[in-house]
Structure formats: structure tokens, C-alpha cells
Amino acid sequence: MDAPRASAAKPPTGRKMKARAPPPPGKAATLHVHSDQKPPHDGALGSQQNLVRMKEALRASTMDVTVVLPSGLEKRSVLNGSHAMMDLLVELCLQNHLNPSHHALEIRSSETQQPLSFKPNTLIGTLNVHTVFLKEKVPEEKVKPGPPKVPEKSVRLVVNYLRTQKAVVRVSPEVPLQNILPVICAKCEVSPEHVVLLRDNIAGEELELSKSLNELGIKELYAWDNRRETFRKSSLGNDETDKEKKKFLGFFKVNKRSNSKGCLTTPNSPSMHSRSLTLGPSLSLGSISGVSVKSEMKKRRAPPPPGSGPPVQDKASEKVSLGSQIDLQKKKRRAPAPPPPQPPPPSPLIPNRTEDKEENRKSTMVSLPLGSGSHCSPDGAPQVLSEAEETVSVGSCFASEDTTEDSGVMSSPSDIVSLDSQQDSMKYKDKWATDQEDCSDQDLAGTPDLGPQKSPLWEKNGSENSHLRTEKAVTASNDEEDLLIAGEFRKTLAELDEDLEEMEDSYETDTSSLTSSIHGASNHCPQDAMIPHGDTDAIPVTFIGEVSDDPVDSGLFSNRNNNAGSFDSEGVASRRDSLAPLQAEHSQPHEKAREEVPALHPASHDVGKGIRVALSNISKDGNLMETAPRVTSFASNLHTDNLNAKVKDKVYGCADGERTQATERVNSQPVNEKDSNDKNAALAPTSWHQRGQNPGKSYRLKHGLTTYKIIPPKSEMRCYDRDVSLSTGAIKIDELGNLVSPHATGIRIISLSSSVPEAESQPIGKVREFWRCNSVEKHLGRPSESSARGPPSTPVPTQTQNPESRLQADPKPISPQQKSAHHEGRNPLGEGRNQPPTMGMGHVRVPAAHTTEVTFLKPQRRTSSQYVASAIAKRIGAPKVHADVVRPHGYAEKGYAGKAPVLAAPPVTVKDDRTSSPHSETQGWKDGAQWPCVTPPNNHGEDLAVGAPPRGEVIGPHRKLSTQDRPAAIHRSSCFSLVQSSQRDRVSVGQSCGFSGKQSTSSQEASSASEPRRAPDGTDPPPPHTSDTQACSRELVNGSVRAPGHGEPSHPPGGSGTESHILLEREEKPSVFSTDGNETDSIWPPSIFGPKKKFKPVVQRPVPKDTSLHSALMEAIHSAGGKDRLRKTAEHTGEGRPAKLSYTEAEGERSALLAAIRGHSGTCSLRKVASSASEELQSFRDAALSAQGSESPLLEDLGLLSPPAIPPPPPPPSQALSAPRTASRFSTGTLSNTADARQALMDAIRSGTGAARLRKVPLLV
């Protein structure tokens, strides 16, 4: 009793306590302390006794019961109350001859007459029994389980409905579709009357309802609700397009269609009638990152075949850049030109889809006039149409600048741009039927045809009164809105500055294209910087690509970037008239020409003056050498006045760079004046081409640039500089598997070439071949300084900077790589400064004997990246040269003070009698250190100016280094890079060399030029020098170059039979090559890969060994030399420093002996003890010494030699183990027999190294 209470009273121990045990049987459920009941053990006993008493009482009692037999016979019987029910059954069956197993008893109560439940052992007396029924048992038939039910096979059927929703139902694949159609309808919540089961929603194949899923072989179908989806289709377009306009086009504040019926009055055919057409969205939303366009049901028909155009225009078919479209989309334009004819009503089945397409299409309606009258007024507010044109032309520069960044191939202009672009092109599905749609299909799809969508500057190209064509477009009246939009666009440009710096570096030009196109570089300047109204000058134009073989009209240039219009004949005539004052200066020196061109037009800062200079020089004088500097300097002057902000600096820098390129392109055109006038008059009205004629490459849009590039129609091969990575941190591995530093190939220093005064005729084919083989470089940095710093150091078409040389050179068309060499982004200089002009291109001819026609080299393009380094080199500043450096060659660049020391360069004569007059110009780096000079490979074996006098001088032009002139933004790329290329690629490393005029006759070594290799002992192998590399080597400050970054690239000899001459420079070494310029003695005969030279062997000094006592001791210990290797130093050395004993005597004889034995040092360290044997040994030794008089002194000398100052190197292990130390020391090989060996051993014992430590002991008798 108390135990459960005690356990319950215990505090919890953290575990749940067990429940109480149930009370013992026979005890009441509730326990009361004061109850009168007995204890539990007594209660159990009492209950059993009560049961016994009850049985005895029942035995004594009898019961009168009525028994009903199975036959229905009732029978009265008296039963004993103590009988169990089972016993009663057995007795009754026995009495009635029945089987007890087949019968059962049923007892009914006397009061209720209901059957009573009982157990077989229940006593009859305990039951209130009145009647007992003896019934026969009914045999219960067991329900046998049937065969197992096989589950019905079912599959999951995917039901697509309402175009975008899905449901999954499990149905039988064996039943017909009409049986499962109710299940599908219930799942999709559609009415079966309107549902049509289709195989898919694209093909629309209707399924037969009588077939099952297995017969059709499908597990997915489309339930088309023809009632709901017809309505949904018609309303789908509006919702989606409205969302897209809110999401993307709302940023540009696109006008509604009602008030932006823009018209483009461009002629569709050679006829003079202008036709208005509506421009669609100029840029598909899909081409903007982050905006996805659903072009699900939008398809367009193919454009009609291109119309036949003039043959000249077929040759230079035009192409529009994506940039012209992004600007159209960014600028909201309303052009009040007459609205275009309305399209026919769309089909009733899809009523709203076409309108939606047109809603998207209407977003950037821009009026692009062809006629004149689009001037930029002096107050800076341009007329409306002018700005529209500026928008187009500026935009077109974006794409052409960027498009070749990563793509190796360019698609046709149909892939690139139609004013309704590829993703949005489906919007015009129902618009092509009308007459206007023919025009839009030609001009929108192939928008190269949009000719004079010109900037205000470009329109003034035509003539004095800005008359380009007879058509005039209606000008809009909302000038204020245009100004506002232009301001917003400049803001957008400001935000894109960072993108500009990264994206503008990847422009590449085609090498083998045939083009006579000219870019109207629209002035992307703020309105206040626009050109005054009265300016009649044209803008510099950019030609990229090869010159056509037949004369092309310089006035009539095909519009390749959708921004340059055709010139009519009177425009050309007036332009030529305006050129008259400039042509008188052709023979003037370079500096004079550069400064007089701006002086002629002091009031007008129009960049266009350069184009007139270029055109006049071509048509009148045919002089290719003259005009580029003037145009470039004038363009730079224009922009020095116009710069107001950093964004403008960047934009104009790009613009100037490409104007420079444009000018050179114009210079390269061999134009006949008469042909110009004739063709101009004939072709001016028809300078529109269809898209199909232009197989050019695709260009992606780029932001922030303001000049245009003519895209050559096709490219033979697209080659990349394997050394230059598009990602800054990429790991680059050259052909030999060497890791190339990713920072070593950024901006290159251009090797500036000078030309010999007499220039011989060089076929243009060789020029093209050389450039095609020689350049694959791509510029990665921002176009830093103009290529005006100097032409590339190319062996064949040498460009000179001397006016005399330029005038003497015959005008030859220059192949596109050379021209693109001058495509340096010219960043504007400070206010009031003149930028150094771009040098004209002269051809210094090489005799045919020295030229090798290499016809198997891969044609490759030359890009502007090869001239980036030239610009940097010019602005870096004068190098810091050590006093011992000899600078015998070339001209040095002008310092900041404008001084121009002119040095005579003795041309170096090479083995093959070729003479070159290199003018080396060392380029200083920011820290004053010399940077790498890589001499270019000359794949053709062509060399410079054989006709030059052997010791002739060529005086370089006076150039200003404008490091402080340039904005700080230009200095962001600060490393020169060596160009790595395989032998096959023929990279012109000369473009990357910072020394002007070095003409290389060697080929680029296959090993990466930018891989730093340091000679083992700090000694660089002298680099081989050809005639051109000697000039470079003498310019070196310390005789070896420092590769960009942290290594000296030195090329091991025998690199694939080709060599790249990389002059190593190190600050810590004295000038190794500074005084010696005659290192071309080992030049091998030239091959197609250029002359080969042997490297001089590198002489290495052995590393001086450490002679300290500790090192000697440790060496002896490690080599098991024992005590004979240890030496005792004098008390006072020659320097007066006290020296410690390097050996401490062992304490006892035993320890010394054991140490000697363990150290394998032989008997040299054993002590001499007095004994008869020792005396006998001494006598033997004396006799032997007297007999060998001549040998003994020698051995004595050997034994008595003083210890060496430097411990000898440890002996080989075999020698140390096989021979005693003494024998090895005294050269046992010289002893002939064992007697000599024994004598030598005894001598060593007595007078060897251990003789000093031997001590006398008293004689033991």
C-alpha cells in the first residue's frame, strides 16, 4: 500500500515514471484503508470458496425445462442445475439418438423469450433457463476466394490545353479515345462538345477518337477548346505586346502609332521619285540582353529578290550596322511626313495579331531624309531631320565597332539588320502586300539601302549649299523635343562608358574585301558643339578593305553603314573646288602641312575638311603620302575644341581614330578625276543596294562610338591572335605548351618604320600578300594615340614620316591591313593642342631579287590593334638612357620640350647584300625602363631600300610625344606586349615593337615571344641581330630587354627553324649590346621563313662554393670523409682574422681509432706508437726512400701540400667506399705496383694531412 505511494512521492529523476501496477485479482478496484474487506490474499481464497459453495447449492437444485427437439417435438425434462451446457447437449443427443456434433443448444429466457448467450462450461443453474432448443447445425459453406483480380493496365496521359496548361490523367491505353474523353474533359474542366483532341498544338493533327492510345502511339495530346481558344488567340497578341512595351519600349518613351507615322523618303529605285515608307522597330528586343521576345506565331515572308542595281554598286553592296537601329529605338522621333498608305485589313481569323506587330513596329519611327537642308545651326539646335540622321549614323558606328569582338564569322546583312530585325520580322506578315511593302521589304530588310541617312556633318559633304539630292524631306517642327531626346541619349552614353572601354577594343577589319565605301562619321558631340551652319567641308571618311582594281568614284561611295549618302556630281565638283587652297601644300614638309590645314579654316572646325584634302590629293595629285596627316590633324583639332566631358572625350577619341582611318582609306583609292565626275553624275541617284547583294559579316551593336566603319563584303579567313585573350584573366598556352602570362599581351608598341628616300615600285599584289600574311593582331586596349605616331614597321610597304620620302614614293593603293593599321582611336588632345598627324603611307620598294612570293600562307587580316602600341610609344616620353649606352642610329623621338635630335643611322649590311636604314626610336615607359622591342618577321624575305646609300642617313620627322597632351583616361593600358604567333600565322611582331623603322628579315619564332625566360646565371644569350635588329639592339639601355610583366623572353636556339629577335633588357646589367652592332655574322641564307641565325653559346660561370669552416666540416661529414677532410687553419689568416681549429683531437686513442675506422679514412689518422715493428718499418721506409730518390720528393711534396683554400668536392660514393681516402687523394692511379702503393701509404701516414696531429710517445721496452 505504502510502496506505490512512496514511489509516487519520489521526485522526478528525468525519466517518465512507470504507471502503477494494476490491483491484484479478486480485489476491489478502489482501495480504502478503513474498508471492512479482507486483505487481498484472503479475498482470493474466499472467492474460490464461494464458487464451490455455489456449485454445491446448484447440485442440490433441479430445474424443470422444456426441451424442443429438432423435429419440433417438445419434451419436458427435469435437469440438474450443476450440469454444464455442453454436458446438457451431449445428454440430450444421447437420449434422442442425435449426433452432438451436428446439433447445438439454444436457450431462451423465460421473461424475454430471447436467446441467451452462454459458454460451453456455463452451469445451467446459473442461467434463467425456461426452454432449451436442440437444433441441428446448418453447415456453413466456406466462401472460396476467387482468382486474384488482375489490375487494369493504365498509363499517365499528359493533356495540354489552353495553350499553356497541362493536366495528367491515368487512363487505359487500350480503350478508344472517345471512352476517355469524358475523363479528359472533367480534368481540364472543359465541355466535351467543344473539345478536339490534337496530336500537338503546332501541327494541329486531329486524332481519331475510335483509336486507342496504343494504336496512336502517343502519351501526350492537346485538348483544343475551339470555343475558348479562338477567342484567346485573337486577344493574345495585345496582352503580350502591351507587356513588352511597358517592360522595354516604355524606357524609350515610344510614341503611339497615331502620332508617330514616321516616313523615310528614300528612293526605292534608280528613279528620282521619293517614296515614303514606315520604319519598323529598328532593333529587335531579342538582341538586347535581358529582354526576351516571344516570336511564337510571328513569321514573315521572305523579302522579294533584290532589284538590279548598277554594277559598281553590286561590287560594293551596302550593309547596315545594328547600331543604326539601337539609336533609332533610343530616340523618339515624329516625322510629319505624309502617312504611308494603310495596309489592307487583316484576316478576321487573327484580327489583332498584325496590329500588335505593327504596335511593336511603330516604336521607333524615324524620319530619315535624303534631301538637303539638314544643317546644324550655329546656336547648337539642329533641325529635326538632321538629328534623325545623326541618330542613324551614330548608331551604325556602334555595331561596326563591336561586332567582330568574338564572332569568327559574319552572317549576311539579312541576319544582321533589317530595320525590322529578325526577331521582330514576323510582325510584318500581313504588310507586304501593298505597294509600300515592296519598298519596306527592300529598304527595311536590307537597310544598306538607306542611303543618305546622314548626320548634319555628312549632309554638308555634298556641296557648299549642302545640296546632295533633289529630294527634300519635310522637316519636323518639334525641335525642342529633339533636343531633349538628344540630351537623354547623351546621358545613356555616359552610363555606358565602362561598357565602351571594354567593347570598343575588339574591332577587326576584313583583309580581302573589295569596297569603295565611305563612312559618314556623324558628329556625336553635344548640340552646342555642332558645326556652324555655313561650313561646307566634308567629314573624313574611313575605308576598310582592299582597293578595287578599277577606278572608283571618290565622290560616290557606297553606303555601307546606313549613314553615308551618295554624292551627286555637283557636290563633288563643289568639293573639289573647295580643295584648291589645300592642294598647293602637297610639297610642304609634314609639320607645315599639319599646322596649315587648320589655319586655312580658322572659323570652321568641321572635321570634313580632311575629306576634301584627301579627295583632292587623290584626284589631282595621286599622292598617297600627303593627305592623311592633314586630315588627321584637322580632325584632332576639331575635337580639341569640342571636348567638354569625359564621355565626350571617349566618344570623340573613337571618332577621331576612325576619321584617321577614313582618311587613309581615301588616300588609298586610285581615283581618276574624270571617272569620278562621270560616275558620280551617273550613279548618285542609284546608290542603294539590296540586302541580298551583301555577303558581309554580322555585327553586333556597340555603345558610345561616333564613327563608322565600312564593313568589307566578305572575308577570306578570320584569324585571331592566339596571344591575345578576350578575357583579362584567361590562361593562355602557346603552341609549345608554354604558359603565357595573360598580362603580357595587352597593348602593343608599334614599331615605327622609316623609309629610304628613293622608293622603287612594289607591286600591289605583294603588298597585299604581305599584309594578309603578316597581321592577325587584335587590339585589346582603348585606342590610345593615333597611329599618326608613325606607320607600322612592315618590311614591304614602308611608311615614311619624311615629307620628302612621302613625296617621292609612287602613289600605290594600300591594302586594307596597312590602312587599318592607322585605325588608331585618336583621343582628343587638350585644348589648343595639335595632335600629331597620321603619317601618309609610302611604299618603299624592294627589288624582286630579294622578295619571296609566299603563296601558301594563310591570308589574315590586319587590325588596328597593331597600331595601339605605336600611339602609346609616342606619348610615353623619352626613355631614361644610361650614360654608357651608344645610340648610333635613327632619330630619337622629341622630348616634351619639342627637341628633335636627329641621329644618322648607318644601314647595316646583311649577308645577302640587303641594306636597310632602320631608325630606331626607343620608347620610354612610365618608369623610365626600356620595354620590349620585337622585330617583325618578314615572311617574304623582302628588305628595305636596297638602293639606299650604304651609310646614308634618313632624317626622321619631328614628332612630338604627347604624353601630357592626352587625357588621363587614355593611360589605362600600361604594358607593352610581345606578340606570340605560330610560324604559320606570321604575326607581324614589328607592329608591336617600339622601335621605328626596324625592317626584319627574320621570321617570328614559333616559341611564344611573350614567354619570359631567364638565362640561368643571369647572363642572357646575345640575341641574333639582322640588319634591322641591330638598330634596335643599340638602342637598348642595358643590353637586354625586359619582357612585359616579369621576365626576359629569350628564345632558345633552334626554335622550329624560325626565330624571333627579342632583345632582352635588364636594368641591373651593364650594356651588353650597346656598343656592338655587328652581330649579324652568323646569318644563314634566307628561307621562306626568313633568314636564320645561330645563337651564341651562353658561357656560365660555376657557382662559387662556400669556403667557410662550417661548410667544409659539414661537407666532410656528409661525404664520410673523416678527419682527413678536416683541415686546420692557421692562427692568423692573411686578412688578420683569427681562425679556429676545425678539428678537435679525440680524447683517447680508442676513440680516434674507432672514428677513423668508422669514417673509412684509412690509416691517415692512426697514431704512431713506439714499438720494434715501427722501428723496422721506419728502416724499411728509409731504404725505400733512398732507392726511389726521384719519386720520394714528389710524394713528399704531395704530402706536404698546404690544405686547399676551397674544400674539394666530395668524392663519388664508389671511390669513397672502394679506395682508402689517402689513396684517392694521392691519385692511386699513378702508382704502378703494390710496393709503390705501400710506400705512398706510409708516406701519407708519416707526412700526410694527419702528420701535424701525430705525437710522440715514450718507447716501451
Swiss-Prot record:
Keywords: Actin-binding, Cell membrane, Cell projection, Cytoplasm, Cytoskeleton, Membrane, Phosphoprotein, Repeat
Highest taxon, organism lineage: Eukaryota
Protein name: Protein cordon-bleu
GO CC annotation terms, alphabetical: actin filament; axon; axonal growth cone; cell cortex; dendrite; dendritic growth cone; membrane; neuronal cell body
Cross-referenced SMART domains: WH2 (SM00246)
Domain called WH2: residue spans: 1109-1129, 1149-1169, 1237-1257
TM ranges: none
UniProt modified residues of type Phosphoserine: 47, 212, 235, 269, 321, 324, 347, 574, 578, 741, 815, 962, 1192, 1227
Record field: compositional bias (Polar residues): 260-273, 409-425, 509-520, 687-696, 796-805, 989-998, 1072-1081
Biological function: Plays an important role in the reorganization of the actin cytoskeleton. Regulates neuron morphogenesis and increases branching of axons and dendrites. Regulates dendrite branching in Purkinje cells. Binds to and sequesters actin monomers (G actin). Nucleates actin polymerization by assembling three actin monomers in cross-filament orientation and thereby promotes growth of actin filaments at the barbed end. Can also mediate actin depolymerization at barbed ends and severing of actin filaments. Promotes formation of cell ruffles.
Subcellular location: Cell membrane; Cytoplasm, Cytoskeleton; Cell projection, Ruffle; Cytoplasm
Pfam families, per the entry: Cobl (PF09469), WH2 (PF02205)
Gene Ontology process terms (BP): actin filament network formation; actin filament polymerization; collateral sprouting in absence of injury; digestive tract development; embryonic axis specification; floor plate development; liver development; neural tube closure
